[in-house]
């Protein structure tokens, strides 16, 4: 059997992946905070872990993939205050947008998608456990984790006690015993979401939500914990502290995998620079399959530089692959992808190396080798491309079905929210692309003009 090796953030080494139970791999990835459109950085993380899960499913008999929805957060509260909408309206709409965008990038949904609001009881129970073990304390309606009680705190992210102290000195709350103590529970005023608890009406802190959802869905120790590199500190450092102190002897997560950052045209993506790109923006420029392919062309731990030129080049590469498949009348995929392709992916999810194998297979297929064409399709399908026939791709239908369905769903949501200007704009956008909508009692259908 091919051996997967992964760079483990915890040990700072690339290691052979050995799940606790080879018959059942358990994986958790931090999901979105649902208050706005998903941006390209969000998408990169989802595509990376979707690809890793595809590889794991190819090599192991059972994989349980959990990715949460953070639907309790001060950013959500602020957006509700800004727009006048209810928190429920905001989280429902933006969760729907997230699902539509990820589907347009051919990311399969996780096996379990817990929401923080669905696990308040688990969160309270975990906090009570930490208090009972002397690792947390109540103060002025808050509950805080006492970092001084965890000798391992800071080691995961490589921060010294001095660095941790320096980082915690900004706006230190008077109720904290130590400046670095972090919130597990905080009081909620009447106008914000809150739940009854032993410490009064309040809501959980962000970090405890993930620890509780992992324990509720996967148990004390999981095989892989993933997320973006920006979560290493404080989020993942704090998750480890909470979970390992609540369950002594537990590893919590055996392997930590982090996706690198994404920049646009060589600069950090930010609204102030005017280069902030949502998934929706980019799907208006290229098929979702091309966006996915671009996100896989850079190794997951490296910085990915997005540009319009890079997206166009990704589309051209896919054109070439589809030409190779077209030459063989869209062959059925081989029973298994070529070993060299799997070996590249198994080497710390080396997608650039795997894509080089796709090019070699396409070269051979263009020279008439039918087996290479079948291997090309099988390999591409494993990483989430070749979702269409060559004819569909070149007629533009690939842009297309997933994107059209996502826009129709967005239009429906806009109409429900009485945002008729947006609904009309979507209809006009689709009409300009030759897509005609027909609204009927059973919903909206579409056809090409």
From Swiss-Prot:
The keyword Coiled coil does not apply. It is an enzyme of class 6 (ligase). Pfam families: CysS_C, DALR_2, tRNA-synt_1e. It comes from the Bacteria. Disulfide bonds: none annotated. Keywords: Aminoacyl-tRNA synthetase, ATP-binding, Cytoplasm, Ligase, Metal-binding, Nucleotide-binding, Protein biosynthesis, Zinc. A motif ('KMSKS' region) lies at residues 268-272. ATP binds at residue 271. Its EC number is 6.1.1.16. It is found in: Cytoplasm. Zn(2+) binds at residues 30, 210, 235, 239. InterPro entries: Cys-tRNA-ligase, Cys-tRNA-synt_Ia_DALR, Cys-tRNA/MSH_ligase, CysS_C, Rossmann-like_a/b/a_fold, tRNA-synt_1_cat_dom, tRNAsynth_Ia_anticodon-bd. One of its GO terms (molecular function) is cysteine-tRNA ligase activity. Binds 1 zinc ion per subunit. One of its GO terms (cellular component) is cytosol. Belongs to the class-I aminoacyl-tRNA synthetase family. Monomer. HAMAP family: Cys_tRNA_synth (MF_00041). This is Cysteine--tRNA ligase. It comes from Acidiphilium cryptum (strain JF-5).
């Amino acid at each position: 059997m091919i051996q997967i090796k992964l760079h483990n953030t915890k040990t700072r080494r690339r290691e052979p992946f050995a799940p606790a139970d080879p018959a059942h791999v358990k994986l958790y990835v931090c999901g979105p905070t649902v208050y706005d459109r998903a941006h390209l950085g969000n998408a990169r993380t989802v595509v990376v872990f979707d690809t890793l899960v595809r590889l794991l499913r190819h090599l192991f008999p059972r994989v349980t993939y959990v990715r949460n929805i953070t639907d309790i957060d001060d950013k959500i509260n602020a957006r509700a205050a800004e727009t006048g909408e209810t928190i429920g309206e905001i989280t429902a709409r933006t969760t729907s947008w997230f699902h539509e965008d990820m589907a347009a990038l051919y990311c399969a949904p996780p096996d379990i998608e817990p929401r923080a609001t669905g696990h308040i009881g688990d969160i309270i129970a975990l906090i009570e456990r930490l208090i009972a073990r002397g690792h947390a304390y109540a103060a002025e309606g808050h509950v805080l984790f006492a970092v001084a009680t965890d000798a391992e705190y800071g080691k995961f992210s490589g921060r010294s006690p001095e660095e941790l102290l320096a980082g915690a000195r900004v706006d230190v709350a008077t109720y904290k015993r130590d400046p670095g103590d972090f919130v597990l529970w905080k009081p909620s005023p009447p106008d914000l979401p809150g739940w009854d608890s032993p410490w009064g009406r309040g809501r959980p802190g962000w970090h405890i939500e993930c620890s509780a959802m992992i324990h509720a869905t996967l148990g004390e120790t999981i095989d892989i914990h993933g997320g973006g590199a920006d979560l290493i500190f404080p989020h993942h450092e704090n998750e480890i502290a909470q979970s390992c102190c609540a369950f002594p002897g537990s590893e919590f997560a055996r392997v930590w995998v982090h996706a690198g950052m994404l920049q646009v045209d060589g600069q950090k993506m930010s609204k102030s620079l005017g280069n902030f790109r949502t998934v929706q923006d980019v799907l208006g420029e290229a098929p979702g399959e091309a966006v996915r392919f671009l996100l896989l062309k850079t190794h997951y731990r490296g910085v990915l530089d997005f540009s319009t030129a890079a997206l166009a080049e990704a589309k051209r590469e896919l054109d070439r692959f589809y030409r190779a498949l077209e030459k063989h009348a869209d062959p059925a995929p081989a029973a298994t992808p070529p070993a060299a392709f799997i070996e590249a992916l198994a080497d710390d999810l080396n997608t650039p190396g795997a894509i080089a194998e796709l090019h070699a297979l396409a070269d051979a297929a263009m020279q008439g080798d039918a087996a290479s064409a079948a291997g090309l399709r099988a390999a591409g399908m494993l990483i989430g491309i070749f979702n269409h026939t060559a004819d569909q791709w070149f007629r533009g239908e690939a842009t297309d079905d997933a994107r059209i369905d996502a826009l129709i769903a967005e239009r429906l949501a806009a109409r429900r929210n009485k945002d008729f200007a947006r609904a009309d704009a979507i209809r006009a956008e689709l009409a300009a692309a030759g897509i005609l909508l027909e609204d009927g009692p059973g919903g909206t259908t579409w056809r090409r003009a």
